[in-house]
Amino acid sequence: MDVWSGCMKGSVFVVLLVFYVVTGRLLSKEAVAHVLGIDNLPANRMCLTTDEYLHGMISLVNELPRLSMYLVIKGNYNAPERIASNVNQIHSTFKELNLKNDSLRKRFDSIKYDVKRLEEILYDLTLRGLLGTSGSDCPDLVPVTDAAFSEQFYTRLC
């Protein structure tokens, strides 16, 4: 089953990213497996391992500073604060895990650089007096314009 591990990590990342962009929330391992349609498969056929889920979560965290910068460019100055809070919570949770010196540990170490990038974004916004100045017309995250996609995505989760 290791032959699919790289694809599974990428798929987990995509599901986590899309759900985060649409809702601003994270998905559990079980919810990701449900979205991917592998929650009811026998374990000997295909399953989502904790390692694959954690790799996908780290990939999400690595992408969030970019999303934060994009939202600032679009005029949403409040979202980076929420994103930074989520990343800090994820980082704290990963610190509690006893990770061995393997690829997951090396990827976990990259989170501290993402935390730093988000802190720099918040620092810049604070210096410019922009933190907390988003108008009510600015979306929380990136708006999804395709209602059919959004409805299918939510239906798949339930």
Kindly label every feature range from the protein language model:
Residues 1-40:
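Long, charged all-alpha helical bundle/coiled-coil segments in cytosolic proteins
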Residues 42-83, 87-90, 94:
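Surface-exposed interaction/gating patches
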Residues 102-158:
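C-terminal accessory extensions/subdomains outside the catalytic/core fold
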